[in-house]
């Protein structure tokens, strides 16, 4: 009987984890029962629209908002779900309860400490803290019903390229077993971190180095969270999407102006959205697209959602 790589990883890692470890995850809410009610995203959509939790105001009418209230605000603005980019602030059980109470889907989790506690760091303790932070994100996303964690693996100036990449590779390899057990792909985002591109070189660079790094794991649990706006400065989005292919699991969405060398609202600037749509169609992309721009209350969120619908032709 033949097994897929996904089946092999799931079975192998479940067997490798100890009973106390699994019991601990059940107690903290990160290993939720399949019989529990889980909010599900809308069906029948090719691209699901999301915003970062960090875009949603923390206060309204002088009152601090709970996670449940902030998720509801995203739902009121018409988003299909939310990317929980403040995962460090919540336990898995808290995230799951907020999703259940709000009725709004959470598809992903992020811990922004990945900039200060990096997998590429020369400091071993920082690398260990990075792994712990990512594990927490996996548990939060899984408990909330999500299917992925976005990570920034580090900075290129942490050392020579071959050294920093190997540090990150070893850290991610340690994370794959938990990713497989919880069904949480590790999604590497392209950022201005001087890795897998030449930060000081002109545009029209390729995505080959990024693709090679992801392929080095030979694992279905490592993929890409493609930030469309981030690398418009350095390469053509349609060409990058063609290079990514099936590796591209989720999208971050913002605008960028090459002419003014600055980020913009979605649809502003000179990013070729027609090419983006063509590239996504060519690779058969379906999944989550998450806004990462300035946020606010419901009206601002509705505007952002409308901008996303326009650039994706929805």
Predicted stretch roles:
Residues 11-21, 41, 105, 120-226, ...:
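Active-site acidic/histidine proton-transfer and metal-coordination neighborhood
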Residues 55-57, 88, 112-115, 153-157, ...:
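Active-site-proximal loop/turn and secondary-structure-junction residues that shape catalytic pockets
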Residues 70, 95, 137, 175, ...:
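Aromatic/hydrophobic pocket-lining residues that form π-stacking "cages" and hydrophobic walls in ligand
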Residues 90, 99-124:
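Mid-chain, structured segments of secreted extracytoplasmic proteins
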Residues 1-78, 145-147, 198, 207-314:
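Histidine-acidic metal/acid-base catalytic patches
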Residues 83-100, 159:
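Glycine-rich, proline-tolerant flexible connector loops at the mouths of alpha/beta enzymes
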